Amino acid sequence: MNALSGLRMAQESVGLISVAHQAFVTIAGCGVNALSGLQVAQEFVGLISVAHQAFITIAGCGVNALSGLRMAQESVGLISVAHQAFVTIAGCGVNALSGLRMAREL
């Protein structure tokens, strides 16, 4: 299941994307990338403002709830992530904020 897979093609050629309250309630099961639809979308974007993304995240076994931000932060100039995964209920083997790993390195 890709909860936001519809954003893949739409955001490829956009200069500025403001994603507010995206995936307001995300309930993810085993092996699900809840925001995987942002993986390809944010590769060519200059500025991304992600506010209140995955506001409530209920993740099951083996889930990377915000894994969609992994590739996004490799080539994006500025990313503003506010109140990301505000409430996270995570099960076994979950990296609830795995999408921020590369962001803190840069």
Swiss-Prot record:
Q: By which gene is this protein encoded? A: yahH
Query: What superkingdom does the record give?
Result: Bacteria
Q: What is this protein called?
A: Putative uncharacterized protein YahH
